[in-house]
Amino acid sequence: MKKDPQELIDSVRQSSEFSNEEKSKLIDSLRKKKHYGLVWEEKPEEVEENQRNWIPVLKEVKERAIVSEAVDAPNHILIEGDNLDALVALTYTHEGKIDVIYIDPPYNTGNKDFIYNDKFVDAEDSFRHSKWLSFISRRLKIAKRLLSDKGVIFISIDDNEQAQLKLLCDEILGERNFVSQIIWRKKTGALDAKGISTTTEYILTYCKSDYLIDKAFSKDSGAYDEKRFKYQDEYYESRGPFYFDTLDRGGLRYSDSLNYPILLPNGKQLYPHGRETFVNDGWTWKWGKEKVEWGLKHGFIDIQKSSKNPSGYSIRYKVYMNVDNEGNTINRTAPHKNLINDILNADAAAVIKNIFGDNVFKYSKPLDLIRRLISFVNNPNATILDFFAGSGTTLHATMALNDEDGGRRQCILVTNNENRICEDVTYVRNKKVIEGYVNAKGETVNGLTANSLRYYRTNFVGRDKTAQNRRALAAASADLLCIREGTYSELTVFGTLKLKPSVARYFEGNGKHILLILNENAIEYLVKEIEYMDSPDKFKVYVFSPGDYAYDDEFADVADRVELCAVPSSIYNACEKVLPARTHDGFFEEDDETSADGWFDEDQAESGNDSDSTIYNKEE
């Protein structure tokens, strides 16, 4: 029989077989042991093991940039690489900034849909579920950090891992933050049914903070029939259109106080159910006497001649679109339902074939499904992340929804390049959507040109905090900073100075001015330029430093015009929160050098010092 954890702790305390130090360690271990929930055997993952020695960064593939001429075009991002590496890099650029995450992870069906350590996991693998849970768990923990306070995450899944995923999400994202398990009917039937035809999948939905659920989600404007509101009166501007409803009703909820007469224009009285006298036949008015008097006075009640009633009259009340029956302004919507049954999976294949002329990707989700989910979130300027991007449906849906409702949502996609999917499918699909294309019928489809797209690959810098690695990480930080600040236009001149990329780089855009200083010898000259530059905005200055010191003293004369940040320490600080522990002792020991004096050798600064020992691209 299993012992209660507290019983085991008491047994350890009373035992004479252990020293006090051993007892302390055992008790601590027992207290940390999970008593309820999901338990599985952690399986090592090669990409995580690689991160014990290397920090992931992002490097732009500039020739693939698609830059819109529209001034306010959102900048979308496509990252080619393992999503665990990309998530670590995004911890620096987007921690607490992602409003919507949608992911469609492998379902672990055992039919070659899930790869772990470069091998397919089949149905006979005894660690099949443990590998999948280890894989998803690592990514969800980082994803939670990326969510904003009002952030929402949608996760598609089927019966193979739904039960395990729900428990895992309760543990990582918080059971109290569970919103709904949306049921999606993806097809009308299944020929391969095992006794019962499975036609549905699930979309687990969680929010970052349960107390902000009401603010995070939009309402369903289609929850009422707009066509019913077909009449107008003199109150149209303030109340909107209306329809009529009967004022009387019959049923079990009878009350004498609601069975009273209403005076008609001909001087007679009318009771509920068209009666001219008081009778308890179960019928009453829906409104009390005082409210009816108020309704008659303010145009909410309509008395019309009617041949159907013995009195010759009928009494109806008006249901307005924009106010309730007491005159209060309302938004006639309702929460979205957790059932989606009007979008089929077959729609996804049709969209892919329409763009490419062939079904080049078999596992994409329907465009309208993702657009529907994004629209559930009450933020037309949301930043959206999909780190199992596949064919890139989430970006396509984001751009389509922006075009529909005028939003400025930005989307970040992450996918590996297995079978060249990132280059040949994800990128090409969305390039066509932006620039326009000819569909399978030979018709021209106009592009959604008010969108920019930038393409990045994951690169790596050594994790040891050597002088060489620090410099390499600072040099590699430029693309991360552009993403972090949403500023992509690089200028080669700063004031009157012509900049060397190995010394300093300057970016403008999105109402921001970003200066990256890689050689502290240039600070004196750059400070003088800032003094004389005519700019109402502050300069965000990222400056290379061996530690956390951002040269505040050197910038003292322009302190009110700059915001300083030391690199690469700010990158180390962000990434260390999610990176696995190092494999050797002495990890992250500081170098002997503690000041910036002589930190840069002039020759090294000009070369950029991008040696193979400190920075590499995993694809090479």
Language model regions located:
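Conserved S-adenosyl-L-methionine
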Residues: 125-129, 133, 150, 160-164, ...
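Signature of N6-adenine DNA methyltransferases within the class I
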Residues: 136, 149-150, 159-223
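Active-site-adjacent helix-turn-beta-strand microarchitecture at beta-sheet edges
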Residues: 18, 23, 209-356, 372
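Glycine-rich adenosyl-nucleotide cofactor-binding module
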Residues: 67-89, 344, 348-381, 400
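DnaQ-like (DEDDh/DEDDy) 3′-5′ exonuclease domain used for proofreading
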Residues: 1-102, 108-132, 138, 300, ...
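PRPP-dependent phosphoribosyltransferase catalytic core
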Residues: 400, 404-620
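SAM-dependent methyltransferase catalytic-core segment centered on the flexible catalytic loop
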Residues: 66-69, 81-84, 88-152, 160, ...
